[in-house]
From Swiss-Prot:
Interacts with apobec2a, apobec2b, hsp90a.1, hsp90a.2, hsp90ab1 and myosin. GO terms for biological process: cardiac muscle tissue development; chaperone-mediated protein folding; lens development in camera-type eye; muscle cell development; myofibril assembly; skeletal muscle organ development; skeletal muscle tissue development; striated muscle cell development. ARM repeats lie at residues 174-213, 216-255, 753-792. It holds the Pfam family UNC45-central. Expressed in striated muscle tissue including somites, heart and craniofacial muscle. Detected in mesoderm adjacent to the dorsal midline during the late gastrula stages and in somitic mesoderm during development of trunk skeletal muscle. Also expressed in cranial skeletal muscle and in cardiac and smooth muscle. Detected in somitic muscle and heart primordium of 24 hour embryos. At later stages, expressed in muscles of pectoral fins, jaw, branchial arches and eye. One of its GO terms (molecular function) is Hsp90 protein binding. Its main location: cytoplasm. The gene is unc45b. This is Protein unc-45 homolog B. SMART domains: ARM, TPR.
Amino acid sequence: MTMGEIGDSVQLKEEGNKHFQAGEIDQAIDCYTKAIKTCKKEDKKALAVIYRNRSACFLKKENYSNAASDATKAIDVDAADIKALYRRCQAFEKLGKLDMAFKDVQRCATIEPKNKTFLETLRRLGAEIQQKLKTTFSTDSRVQNMFDILFSDEPDKEKREKAANNLIVLAREDAGAERIFQNNGVPLLMQLIDTGKPEMILAAIRTLSGMCTGHRARATAIIHSVGISKLCSIMAVDNEEIALATANLFQCVNDSLSGGDKRNYGKEEALVLDSSKDLKDILLALLEMIASKNVSGHGRDQALNLLTKNVPRQNKKSTDNSKCLFTIDHGLKKILKVCGQVPDLPDQLPMTENTQLIASVLLSKLYDDLRCDPERDQFRDICDDYIKSKFDPNDMDKNIHAINTLSGILQGPFDLGNVLAGRQGVMEMMVALCGSEREVDQLVAVEALIHASTKTSKASFFISNGVSLLKEMYKKTKNEKIKIRALVGLCKLGSAGGDDYSMRQFAEGSTEKLAKQCRKWLCNPTLDVRTRKWAIEGLAYLTNDADVKDDFAEDEPAMRAMFELTKSNDKTILYAVACTLVNCTNSYDKKEIIPEMVQLAKFSKQHVPEQHPKDKKDFIVRRVKRLLKAGVTSALAVMVKADNSILTDQTKEMLARVFLALTEDVKDRGIIVAQGGGKALIPLALEGTDKGKIKASHALAKIAAVSNPEIAFPGERIYEVVRPLVSLLGTDRDGMENFEALRGLTNLAGLNDKLRVKILKEKALPEIENYMFEDHEQIRQAATECMCNLVCCKEVQDRYLEDGNDKLKLLVLLCGEDEEKLQRAAAGALAMLTAAQKKLAVKMTKVTEQWLEILQRLCIHDNPEIQHRGLVTVFNMLDADDQLAKKLVESDMLEILTYVAKLEDNPKKQNAIDAARACLSKAMDNGLIKPFSN
């Protein structure tokens, strides 16, 4: 190795040190890594120092495994390297290896027995180890005791339930889960499952879920010990709670095996086998379940839900969609089979009311996960071949299975469904089945017809070919189920023009008659939920017409009946309810109509959409008020809690739109909060489409801006509100969103330090500072008010202390603005900053020459609040620096202080008068003035 290379390693080490001191940890690691490569292997001492330094970097990055490894390499060279020993101790502690951390700090304390840091760490680790040993021994006995109670013939049911619940709670803690696992827990839990008692099965499954959470090695051992087929057979039982608990266990296993386990095991990692085979086996087992006759409806739903959640890519930027392609190859036909099931026919798979829709959602997710046209072509060909294979002129049951499968596809990837519906003979088959004598044929055909007429082109086909047939079915059939579906078909065809007043498909008044019948069925409690659901489907289409939505908003019993149905077990209703509410509140996106463009379109004989008179602002406001009175907020809160497989991102976006429309009027926000609207908005703001999250965040901001956040978002939920509000501060968002987000954050920042720290962690500070420079008066005022509440934080104060920026100058100049609310906020921030940091009291005199003039204006302001803030700032300056105090007393400020201090006591101005008197007392204490004597 040349002298140049040796010099390089020293230079790189020095460069790394500079980066570390500047807080540039990644660059420091790069420099140290290069230094290690260029350093001479024989120069062990130099290498040890570099490893020790890199260990400090890894500690900062919370990469504790690498930190321990580098510290060990330094200790191998010099066993008495006290810095390396202490760094390894810190890393071991974070990795949970308390005994090894204790040994390292013990050696540190031996080398430097008077070092308080080492002695404190030694004492703390000793106490933690003792506590851990105590917990371990007590946990072992508790685990054994619980199993004894569960396996005994204990007649006290309450005692057994308590033991089962304790076991579940214990399994959720890592130490408890490990003790259960080590004490032969898995075979004992399997014995509990084999008792066949539902409460015992639930307890065992939930305990296993806790043991598998976040621990890959344990999850692998459990899945091999219990067996995937055994777990599938448990999930297949006809018990909703057991099916749900087993699905949760599968999810915990999947998360742990696919990287949800965030721990770093170092060398122990080598003992864990590759988990890809286990994940593949689970996927195949779930695909087998969905088309098996031995699986209950609840079990099938959960298998479909697991596939929906885990097969498509979580991050669309990833190019690996192999799981999706594997699922299509091995399971697409099975999913299509589920979609095609007709419950009214014999020999069908057991299903719940939600099964077909969950299968449709899965189809949609799989189709969306495909990356190129050849993949989509393969998907389409499999669906096409499956439907064609079911068409049989001699077997009507097979035909309706094919049409029902198409219905399922139309409810999922509808673009694909529209292509398949356009195949030769498919539409004709639907129309022919509508005229069949069998009621089940009519039922399936009408449903397919409704789903197929999504596009105006398809609707036109049905308007010319199917309207008379639907009218005939509606008039002649005595079966309410068919009657209502025929009506919905007519509703959908009648709404094919959307909200365009000039594109009505039917004659004036026809849609109102259809809607009236839908409302009548909706309010009929003797009809089953599924039939009444179709009445809402009809309204979802018809409420595109402003006359219909206005009539519906005036029919309070119909609205209440719809809201009540959202609480039923059939959650397939949610999309239709959301559509109806979006239509009633007009919360869909509307393009801005430019009069010149309208004239141009008319001149060129292009169609121009017309607004219905009842779609104007005052009508919308009236409808919103009626919806709130009928209890729409409670219904929305229930809908938000639905399972994600049913509550799709599109449905969430619609709910967010409705919430935003409801919160428009400040007077209505209290009712929304009282009915749980604040809590319901949080998940909508955190998950869903980008547009939906923004709408929900805006609604949250409107509530947070005017309500007490502790009441609107009780408990820990309040901390979840911060991120959605910060997302509205981007410069790409419109001014109203910026303004209301700032007002909401101001309210939150005024509550406690924890919330202020959370706002800073979400990187809101640069955005808030940016808006303090905004030209728009209200946005600038809101940003300044928010900053006024944030300056209590040390981190914010430090930013004002930094040189090379105009933050403090801006604050001083804002105090001189004419707008009172802006002045009050800026003066408040200045008063708090100068109270917290004396250096800032001196610095403010250097940032602008106008500081004294502005301060004097504050101290003689007509508004007592602003005057008080100005006088507090003067007091802080008198207290901060003798020279500054002298300068203030020699100016006109003394005259102002004397005038205010001599005012008679006045409740409205008392704070300002007291502050002025305190300033004079301070000046007297400093020997700058003397008391007046006769």
